[in-house]
């Protein structure tokens, strides 16, 4: 009997030791290596959810656009700073941005296209569109032109995180991503795909490639040779502050050949699948091995039904949507792929009852493992490079939630979170710059 008790006590000791390993060594959030999170924050989307004392929508725009820089590391509390009124950042677009490979620069894209509901907002006086902006205004510290088609370059190595260069575009830049070569940045806009590089703290255009397919939500394959984009064109010319008349989106496959981006084919749904592209089909992301793309069938919420996740097979000569996950959530906004190649996470778009969806992408077919509670209207989502933590931003709570990763597939919500500016709309992650 004594031996049994000794074994029992030994087992308890081992379990206690294992549990202790899951507890943070410090009383604050840490990461194994120094990293930087960049969150862009759209005052307009936050304003849509603010109420007057009469509980009607307050259409007077008082929430400022901002971006938040968060430095995390192994031996210090999170260093968080939010900068207001220097880089416009509208929410409509893929919820990610560009960051230089050394973590020194961040790039935010803003455009003037506005869905009908946002036209109700009463903006403060001042410049609004490209036509209102003089060359000198581009060099001012403050820049609040909500409907400008502009790209902002932020120096993350300087304490007050100044915007060191702004570039106006004639068309509507929806999204910016770093190219895997670590040197170039791709901007997807309504008429062109642009390639930029950074020279002496300025954006320099390398080339632009014309396309006829409309505003792109895109992602680049890990080898840098292709990109896939969901695109919607307008039946009438797009104007700043206007909604246009958007056609049904299509999904397209492009080759990146040197500094040119060339259309290859439309990515269609396999005829045997009982799913479809919807007017709100939009955001997508490519897996870390480049073999699949997850596509949001409906990038908005309804409060009454659920939408699918479309899955494109990128290994085919002409990629095709060959499977889907039915009724994943009330709208899907974004995806993150864990470095282990087994787990992916999708964000839902519920306002008051929201979730993230954990997927097993190693199974055939891809399957949902479970859902977890998350704050309303999820946007940006990123794993740390080592895969130990997951960050999920919310558009209406002014925070980024943190989930700890346990094993291959388990997430545990950390009670600690990171404050960001209200209206969070995009998130990107990179190394902390070290000069």
Please annotate each region the language model reported.
Residues 22-435:
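Predominantly soluble domains enriched in secretory-pathway, periplasmic, or organellar proteins
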Residues 1-7:
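Positively charged n-region of N-terminal signal peptides that target proteins for export
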Residues 7-17:
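Bacterial N-terminal signal peptides
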């Amino acid at each position: 009997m004594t031996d049994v008790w000794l074994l029992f006590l030994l087992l308890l000791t081992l379990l206690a030791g294992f549990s202790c390993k899951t507890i943070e060594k410090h009383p604050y959030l840490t990461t194994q290596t120094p990293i930087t999170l960049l969150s862009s924050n759209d005052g307009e989307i936050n304003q849509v959810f603010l109420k007057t004392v009469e509980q009607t929508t307050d259409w007077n725009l008082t929430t400022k656009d901002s971006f938040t820089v968060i430095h995390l590391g192994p031996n210090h509390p999170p260093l968080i700073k939010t900068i207001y009124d220097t880089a416009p950042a509208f929410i409509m677009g893929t919820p990610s941005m560009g960051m230089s490979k050394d973590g020194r620069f961040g790039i935010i894209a803003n455009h003037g296209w506005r869905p009908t509901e946002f036209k109700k907002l009463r903006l403060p006086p001042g410049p609004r569109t490209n036509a209102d902006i003089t060359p000198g205004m581009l060099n001012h510290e403050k820049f609040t032109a909500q409907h400008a088609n502009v790209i902002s370059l932020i120096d993350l190595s300087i304490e007050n995180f100044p915007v060191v260069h702004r570039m106006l575009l004639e068309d509507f830049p929806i999204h910016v991503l770093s190219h895997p070569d670590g040197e170039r940045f791709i901007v997807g806009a309504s008429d062109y795909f642009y390639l930029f590089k950074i020279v002496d703290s300025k954006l320099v255009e390398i080339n632009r490639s014309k396309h006829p397919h409309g505003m792109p939500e895109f992602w680049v394959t890990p080898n840098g040779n292709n990109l896939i984009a969901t695109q919607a064109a307008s039946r009438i010319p797009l104007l700043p502050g206007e909604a246009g008349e958007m056609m049904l989106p299509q999904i397209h496959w492009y080759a990146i050949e040197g500094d040119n981006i060339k259309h290859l084919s439309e990515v269609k749904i396999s005829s045997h699948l009982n799913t479809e592209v919807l007017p709100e089909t939009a955001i997508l992301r490519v897996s870390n091995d480049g073999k699949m793309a997850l596509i949001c069938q409906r990038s908005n919420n309804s409060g009454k039904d659920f939408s699918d996740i479309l899955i494109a097979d990128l290994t085919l000569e002409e990629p095709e949507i060959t499977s889907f996950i039915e009724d994943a959530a009330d709208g899907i906004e974004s995806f993150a792929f864990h470095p282990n190649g087994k787990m992916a996470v999708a964000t839902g778009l519920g306002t008051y009852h929201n979730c993230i969806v954990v997927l097993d992408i190693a199974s055939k077919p891809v399957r949902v493992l479970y859902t977890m509670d998350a704050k309303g209207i999820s946007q940006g989502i990123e794993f740390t490079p080592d895969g130990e933590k997951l960050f999920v931003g919310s558009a209406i709570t002014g925070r980024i939630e943190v989930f700890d990763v346990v094993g291959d597939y388990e997430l545990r919500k950390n009670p600690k979170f990171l404050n960001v500016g209200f209206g969070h709309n995009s998130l990107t992650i990179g190394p902390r710059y070290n000069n």
